[in-house]
Structures are given as structure tokens and as C-alpha cells.
């Protein structure tokens, strides 16, 4: 369930966000219209999408086959639209906070980016779309970005920023408190929640499905 069933005051189903990462090629496909229109119609405010808007596909610049105004398109779907510089970390963080504050619409964060950022010869071209830079261009890119570390060396400052063990344990402990309280107050819903997480169908699914098939097989009503 995307929104808390029966609007319980405490609901572990509704305490998370779903993040998706999209590219120009993704939004060209027809299925994107169906899915995004559905999300907007049903006000799935826990859905946050990052659109990597670099204007490049594997066949080159998209100008000749994809000229949609994506921001207006998603506004028409009833989405919350945030446009940012996709290389600006502060803008990214602020956009995520704005998305989380939205309570009635899904959010798309349009990140204007340059594919192959930092590569002197291949930045902004389809040559870096799924293809390696090559040894010479790697050296040029490292020099251009002033990256002085050796191959496969991760700076200690990066390790520090990504070390989420302590904070992660705190969040896990807080989450467990919520789960315990929820399971005590709503044991039936919690049991159903665990079933869904385990990917299991309800015990009466087969019976209900058979009854449904039997009904429509003898019903005169035409179903498309």
C-alpha cells in the first residue's frame, strides 16, 4: 500500500520514500506517460524522481527527436517540479528537502547536467554514453579535475563522509521502536505488512481468484 490503509495514526507502510533515477531516454518511452500520469493522479507524494537532464542519448544529441518541455509536462501530471544544477550538491540537498515537504504530489527533480563531466574531449557528447574514456582521456580528465589520487585510491575524507554506521544504527533502532509499537497496536495489519514484504500472496488469494474467473466466464458482461 502506498498510502496508509485505513489512515492509521501510526503506519510503517508510509514512513519511507521511493527514489527513481530517470534519463532522457526513459522519458521518451510511452510507458513513462502512463506511469507518471498514474502517480500524479493518485498523489503519490512519497515518490521522488531525479531526472538526469543532459540532452544526450546513445545516438547523440536529442534535439531531433525529443523536444518536450519536461517541466511543464510533469506539472500537467500534477507533479511537484524542482529544477536545479545537477552538479551543485547544495542544490541537490535542498531539492530533496523540498520534495520531502510536499504532501500531495510526487516530485521530479530536473537535474541539468553534462554527461562525462570533466572530460576535456568527451564531455557533453554521446561518446561517453556507455563507453570507456580510454587511458589518455582518463589522464586528461584527472588533470582537468585536479584529481591527484592514485587508481582505486579513495581519499580518507570520502570514507568519512560515507561512513554511516553510527547514524545508521541510530536510525535502525528508532525504526525498530516504531515497528514494535505498530505491531502491538495493529497486529493484523502488521502481519499483513510482513506478508507483503516477504512477497507472499494472501492465503485466500487462489480461492478468490478462482471465484473471480468463474464469475466472469459465465457473466454476460463484456470486459475489454
Role assignments for model-derived ranges:
Residues 1-12:
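Single conserved hydrophobic/aromatic residue that forms the stacking wall/gate
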Residues 2, 38, 73:
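Hydrophobic/aromatic ligand-binding patch that stacks against planar heteroaromatic rings
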Residues 13, 42-43, 102-103:
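A structural signal for short coil/turn segments at secondary-structure junctions
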Amino acid at each position: 500500500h502506498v498510502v496508509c490503509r485505513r489512515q492509521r495514526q501510526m503506519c510503517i507502510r508510509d514512513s519511507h520514500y521511493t527514489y527513481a533515477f530517470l534519463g532522457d531516454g526513459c522519458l521518451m518511452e510511452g510507458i513513462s506517460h502512463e506511469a507518471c500520469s498514474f502517480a500524479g493522479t493518485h498523489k503519490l507524494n512519497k515518490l521522488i524522481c531525479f531526472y538526469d537532464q543532459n540532452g544526450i542519448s546513445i545516438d547523440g544529441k536529442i534535439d531531433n527527436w525529443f523536444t518536450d518541455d519536461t517541466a511543464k509536462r510533469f506539472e500537467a501530471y500534477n507533479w511537484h517540479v524542482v529544477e536545479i544544477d545537477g552538479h551543485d550538491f547544495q542544490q541537490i540537498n535542498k531539492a530533496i528537502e523540498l520534495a520531502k515537504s510536499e504532501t500531495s504530489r510526487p516530485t521530479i527533480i530536473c537535474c541539468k547536467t553534462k554527461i562525462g563531466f570533466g572530460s576535456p574531449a568527451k564531455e557533453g557528447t554521446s561518446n561517453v554514453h556507455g563507453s570507456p574514456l580510454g587511458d589518455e582521456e582518463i589522464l586528461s580528465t584527472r588533470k582537468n579535475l585536479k584529481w591527484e589520487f592514485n587508481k582505486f585510491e579513495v581519499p580518507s575524507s570520502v570514507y568519512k563522509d560515507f561512513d554511516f554506521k553510527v547514524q545508521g544504527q541510530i536510525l535502525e533502532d528508532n525504526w525498530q521502536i516504531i515497528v514494535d509499537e505498530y505491531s502491538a497496536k495493529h497486529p493484523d495489519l502488521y502481519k499483513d505488512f510482513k506478508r507483503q514484504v516477504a512477497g507472499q500472496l494472501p492465503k485466500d488469494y487462489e480461492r478468490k481468484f478462482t471465484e473471480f474467473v468463474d464469475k466472469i466466464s459465465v457473466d454476460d458482461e463484456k470486459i475489454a
